[in-house]
UniProtKB/Swiss-Prot annotation:
Residue ranges, annotated region (G3): 115-118
EC annotation from Swiss-Prot or TrEMBL: 2.7.7.4
Similarity field: Belongs to the TRAFAC class translation factor GTPase superfamily. Classic translation factor GTPase family. CysN/NodQ subfamily.
Source species: Agrobacterium fabrum (strain C58 / ATCC 33970) (Agrobacterium tumefaciens (strain C58))
NCBIfam families for the chain: CysN, PRK05124.1
The name this protein goes by in its record: Sulfate adenylyltransferase subunit 1
Region of interest (G5), ranges: 207-209
Amino acid sequence: MSAAAANTPSSSATILPFAEHSKVARDTRPLRLITCGSVDDGKSTLIGRLLWDTKAVKEDQAATLHRDSGKQNDLGLPDFALLLDGLQAEREQGITIDVAYRYFATDRRAFIVADTPGHEQYTRNMATGASTADLAVLLVDARTGILEQTRRHATIAALMGIRQFVLAVNKIDLTNYDKAGFELIAHEFRDFASDLGIKQITAIPMSALKGENVVLSGKASMPWYEGPTLVETLELATVRSTQSGGFRLPVQRVSRPGESFRGYQGTVAGGSVKPGDSVVVLPSGMVANVKQIVTFDLVRNAAVAGDAVTLVLDRQVDVSRGDMIVSIEAQPLTGLAFDAQIVALQPGGIEAGKRYWLKSASRRQRVSVQPVSQLNLREGEWQAHETSLPMNAIGKVRLSFDETAIFDPYEQNRATGSFILIDPDTNNTVAGGMISAKRSTGATEEQGDRVILSLPAGLAEKLLAGELLAKHRDEIDIRRTDAATASRLIGDLD
């Protein structure tokens, strides 16, 4: 987005063309978003205004708002931030500490919004809110512009996989609706965001307190701005799909109500499945076909990401809580060593080399954590750092497991690519993390000392189901291909 051209419809709404607002094939799934930015930029006020103008505030809340606003607001308008600041400490200090989640809806879409703290000491709370969001609304005070904490939050949001950003230049009324100042801020953020790989940016000048360009248009005060309001932009945003990748079912429970029934229960974390599909149980590598998909009251002909189901297989296989049932043709990564990025959440930080409990989906196992580098948020650069990571630090680490771990890269699947670290001494959650890649550890793999076997699919599945190969499932690289390609590959080896 060119900031200088922010007053044109095509450039001010880069998520989707605003000019075709009524014609766009709209994604109607609920949108999860996060508001972030430096302290006192107006995040809570903005969400409060969204709730107020979309009629999401109940009568008793409205009465309380009018009663309490007189204590803190001298502008003649309700203090909309009071709808969000729920902790006593927040109200006394006039800041956000915890992550507050709120729900609102328009005629076109529903929204779940997380209001996150702006103070540096609560960076961990902001990272938590960003981990489930599809879009970030980054607030900037029109008087002060881009600050260090603004860059910090944009960087964290990008690390958490958010690719859609709204740059909300708030309090524009306090600059006498200065167009040049708005364009300068938008241009500065565009340059910074390009280094983070952020391309979908919509810059909007607004006054959250007055409600200009939030839900209702601010054209009366800003005739130079012809782009969308915040709500119009949110209505056109897209939601990350988890149904397009491989099937993933982290097993939460094995159901045995009687001798004749054995089902594997969990919530589908990715892809889809239907009766007759071939699946593999990880980490054992046992292969089976889906016989039936059951919910609490009916038998289904398919299941997709987000569905809580019981899966019945066509043969007896050894499955327990923590295993993952996946599609054969698109399997996750399995191994004993992975690279990851983490956010330290507790005052003690992350100790180098210490063994923690790692929990991902329904699987829990012991892991050793070795920091590699730490993100310098002021400079936006990764710096070598092999000692302990302090609280609020973002670091790259190496994870070493005693038993086979199962992950997808976080970029491909948030549910199976994320994890938490638990201190075994205190049972506190000390870090949240994202898998970036599997790390090679075996000497033979590094030296290329491997044998390629080309087998018919049926025979390969039988071999993998055997006890010997099942024990070495994490060392086997399966690549499915057609007979012609297999013949060509074997010919290339001669």
